[in-house]
Structures are given as structure tokens and as C-alpha cells.
């Protein structure tokens, strides 16, 4: 349908003409907000076509399974340009009997059909409510380059009357933050090697290992209960300070040595490979260790539409943990020694850096600053501030229990 020269109010009246049921709730996304959501959700659209949408007074959650694992994308109510809600939560399937889906509105396209506005209208009474989704976009008209035609598409769905759903609301015991370059290393690792994924954390390092012996390692600076970071082995090689700092990850929680093995590698691999980070986005790897029989690893992407995913795991036995840790530490130390410059050159580099940055003699220690001691030399290098670790900001959407069950 084409609509020419319509004001917002006139357009709204015409869009909802024919749906005479009284409106009980409403949600609106305009172009500026919608553009950010499309850039965040579009890479996952093909995985989300059969997803479930949950509306409540706290906003919208998009929930789907990814290779048998659970994935959640919360969009809080304050992100909508208009959001009015009354009544209990409403659950609808995104898929329709045809080729359309409620998720199509979040797909990025190269043609002008990318939506500029998105409306959700809710009618009826539970458990027989309906949702009317209206997607509005513009296309070039036939009267010249300045002629723009407003088009719209509507999808109508009924709510699910019976459903069971899980919303994890645990607080992670340990949360590790990865920047974009560090997350790219994880993607390359999972793309190159196959079938199993193992996480090992010590007091100073985090190792991620896959089948075939491939692994990546990071130096960990952990913020415990808001205190200063615990000491870590910052300097493995001083030939390139930028490379050293790129190997440092920051996190929070109660650190202890442990290892977990994911029960399904394919789900974690698919989630990581389908996510792309911008320079302003970060990824948090969360570890849930309170349940000793069923630990979980969580993946949280901090963006306009944050992505939460959870993967069941099992603890490594003390014997396996020791064997894996010994082999990876040995290989990491061999690489460190190979890259280390001669001692005389190393001292010259340290002296120049110390004089330039601090104006103190070698070995000077500035008070009230986060400093870390190098290997075998009395030199201190300043570390970046700790980035507070993310938590499940919208994990309490299920306030009654972890499992929601409504029966008609």
C-alpha cells in the first residue's frame, strides 16, 4: 500500500483502519532508534525468524534457540519512542503461515525497503489478545528524485495461550570483558579448530582451548567487589606495549582456579561467529559456578539491542585441569621467551619509557595509581582503568520464577 503526503496522525489513523477493536497497548520505534536496533539484530535475523516475542511492562524480549542453546535479546521499554502497556505479559510466535515474520522489520536491506518506523498495536483481552505490526518505509516515486512514496506492511498475530519459558536470573560469579580485537581472536580460534571448547581460569590468566590443541590466552586483571585490580603478569614482552595491553582483559567476581568444558561446541561457535562487534561494543564472558553440578557459561554483547546467550558446561576433573593448564602454560612461556629482546636493549627501552611517562628514575612508584611490576626488572607500567563488568541487566524480567508457565 502506498501513502502520499500523510502526516503522522493521518498515517496512524489510516494504518489502523479496519481494526476496530479497542487498543489496549502500544509500542512505537522511529527511524533513529530503529536504525540502531537493525544494525544490532540484522546479523541474527535468519536465526530469529522462528523466535518468540515477549511483551511486558518492562519492554520486549526476543527469544530463540541457537543450535539447541538459548539466546535472548532484550529491548527495554525506555528504548522505545513510545511504549504504553497494561495487563500481563504477552507471548507471540514471530513466524506466520506465509513467508513473513515479525522479525523481518529488523532486517537490513540494501534497497529502500529498510523500515523507517515500526508500530505495534495490541487489542483484545488475555488470553486472546492480538498484535498488529505495521512497518513503514519510503521508496522513490515516479515524479522525480524528490518524489518519495510512503509504503507500509502489516502483520497480525494472536498470542500464545500456553507456553513454558526459562529466564535465567543468576548473577555471574566471574565476568570477563573482551574488546573487539580480543573477540576477533576468539572468532578465529573457533573457526579454525573444531568440536570442543574449554575455558580455564587461574589467578592471572584465562585460557580458551578447542579440540586439536588450539588455544588463546589473556592476562586477567580482576576487580573484586569494587576494589583495585589484583596483580597480574602484565609484561611478557616489552617490544610492543600496545600488543601487551591488547592481551589484558578486565573483569569482576570472586576468582578461583577452575576449568569448564562446554557440553555443545556448535551452539557456542554459531553464536560467536554470527556476532560482529563495533569499536564501541564489548563482549562479556560470564561464568555461573554456584551450581556445582551444572555450571554455565554466558555470552553477553553490550550494544543497542544487547544479546544474552547461555551454554551448559561441566567442570574439568583436577587431573584434566592440571594437564591442560601445564601444557598451555609451557607453550605460552616458550612464545614469551622467544619474543623477549636482549637484556641491555630491554633496560634502555624501560629507561626511556620511565623518563618520558613519569619523570622519575627507574623503579619509581607513583602513589594511588594502578601499577604492575615487570618480570625480573624493577619497572612499573601504568594499566588502563578497569571497565566495570556487565551483568544481566534485564534478567529479572521473570519476577515470579525462573520458569514461566501459563495455561489457558
From Swiss-Prot:
Keywords: DNA replication, DNA-binding, Host nucleus
Any one cellular-component term (Gene Ontology): host cell nucleus
Signal peptide: none
Highest taxon listed in the record's lineage: Viruses
Motif annotated as Nuclear localization signal, chain positions: 344-353
Pfam families according to UniProt: Herpes_UL42 (PF02282)
Annotated family: Belongs to the herpesviridae DNA polymerase processivity factor family.
Protein name: DNA polymerase processivity factor
Classification lineage: Viruses, Duplodnaviria, Heunggongvirae, Peploviricota, Herviviricetes
